[in-house]
Each structure stands twice: as C-alpha cells, then as structure tokens.
Amino acid sequence: MLASLFSKPQSSLSAQAKHLVAMRFLIYTGFQTSYFIGVIGTLTYADDASVVATSLAVLFMNVFVILGSFAGGAALDAWGPRRHFLLSIVGALATGAAILVFGSATGIVLLGAVLLGFALGFAQPIATSYPAYLTDDPVELKDINSAIAMFSNVSIIVGPTLGGFVAAATSSRAVFVLMMIFTVLALVAGWGFRPQAGRVAARESDLAESGATASTASQSSNPSTFACVTFATSIKTVFTNSVLALLFCIIFLSNFGYGAFDPLESFFYRDVLHVGVEWMGWLSSASGVGAVLGAVAALTLAAAPGQP
C-alpha cells in the first residue's frame, strides 16, 4: 500500500516536475548526510568539544540558513532558476571541499557550520519557489509541492542513514564526501531541467509589478540595493497575510523547541546511550519515518475527489 502511495505523485507529474523533485531530493539528501554527523558529531566525538561549541554550531548554522535563504531568493529573482541551481551546486561542493581540506579543529568545524548553513539556505528556493516556474495551475502546483515535501522527508531518512554507515566505516568528516557525491547527482538530475520561458518571464513580470520600490530596485545597477528591497518585500508579504503570518509563527515556535534540544542530543547519544557517532545518523533518521507518513497522508487527501 505504501509503495502505491509513493508511486501516485510521480504518475501525475510532468517530466520537468520529476526533474525538479529529483533535484531537490538529491541535493537535500546530501545536506542531510552531513549536518548532524559531520558538524555536531565531529565536535562531540572527534574534538570532545563542550556544549557551548555545539550550541554555537547550531546557532551559526540556523542564522546562516536564514541569511542564505534571503540570498538565494534574491539570486533566483535576479537570474532565474537555472543559474540559481548552478550556484547552489557550486556552493555545496565548495563547502564540502573546504571542510575536508581545512581539518576538524573546533574553529574550523564552526566555520563549516556557517558555510553549510548558508549553502543549505541558498538552495532552499529549489523546493519553495521553483514549482511556480513550471506551472500556475493550482492542482499541478499542489501535486508538485506534495511530491517535493514527501521526498524531502525521505531525505531525512536516507541521508542520515547513509551518513551513519560512512561514519562507521571511516570518520565523521567523511560524510562530506557523500554530500558532494549527492550534489553531483543533483546536478545530473537537473541537467534536463528547463523551466518554460513564458513562465519565467511571467514570474519576473509579477515580481516587477509587486511594488514601485521593487521595480525601481530591479532596474538599479546596485545588486545589494535590489537584494535589500527583495528581502523587505518578502517580509512584508508574509506579515500582511494572516495565513502566512500564522504559518510563520507555527514554524518558528516548533523549530524553537527543537533548537533548544539540538545542541544536547549528541551528548545524550555519547554519554547516556554510549553509542558511536554513526548512531547519530541512524537514530535521527527515525524521525523522518513519521514525516514521510504524514506527507503521504497529505498527498492522499490532496488527491481525493472533491478537493479544491
């Protein structure tokens, strides 16, 4: 039954949408192989760092995810999805290579958390914004978004599980090699990704007409001015829409609670459960099971007859 549910979203997707789902799945799986084991695991097990260090890693990671998402959104608006995707690939590969080259000292790992967070945030529009470059049909958008959500949750299972096996066989830093492999696979999957020119033009037109200030900034030769206006427009859009504002608050509070425990989780594995760094991946992947089941259920409800 579960297999049939997994095949259901793909059967209704266009070829371009399938490319998009594969791109997101592969690049996000790469990130999932590396964050918990590669950053937090290295600090806890290899460096024997303190809770302060893991807390800083989580803080830096999440702050730069936000900054990266702002930068990624601005880059997408300015250059379109194909160039944005190539920049996301380059950023992920450069991050993995830098962490591998410069070693596992605590300061280097914290810098790695910064780079990884920015790269992850920069790539986030692949999931959130690319579907609108393929279609404006509400039903098709719902199918694409549901498939992306489901396979993103599959990444939460696959990534840490594979990362655990790599860490068990080699070291916690070796997971960044795995991240780079998945990034290259994402590039291969995205090679045939061709957003319709008309859709891209229409979206750029919508962005240009979203406000007089944004229009002026888009014509400006100063990229930083355009980026700042884009950020301000995005924030205004969220907080002037009650549904988006409520969704923002729900996501913020849920992640706030998760973030409070995140720096301590690795010490629980090491000092209470007395397991190796590989178990950080294997046990954390279990949280993805419920996420996948929830995404599949949402997809089933969306596909039910009579749904808007």
Walk through the language-model features, giving the residues of each.
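MFS-fold secondary transporters
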Residues: A98-L100, L116, A189-G190
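Helix-to-coil boundary motifs at intracellular loop junctions of multi-pass secondary transporters
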Residues: Y45-D47, A78, Y130-P138, F268-L273, ...
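Helix-loop boundary and gating motifs at the non-cytosolic
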Residues: L2-V63, V243-S287
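A helix-boundary/kink motif common to multi-pass secondary transporters
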Residues: S50, G80-P81, A105, S171, ...
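C-terminal ends and interior cores of transmembrane alpha-helices
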Residues: V90-S104
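Symmetry-related core transmembrane helices of the 12-TM Major Facilitator Superfamily/SLC fold
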Residues: A174-G192
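Juxtamembrane intracellular "pre-TM" segments in multi-pass secondary transporters
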Residues: M1-A17, P195-F248
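Substrate-agnostic recognition of the 12-TM MFS/MFS-like secondary transporter fold
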Residues: H19-F36, M61-L76, G80-A92, I108-A168, ...
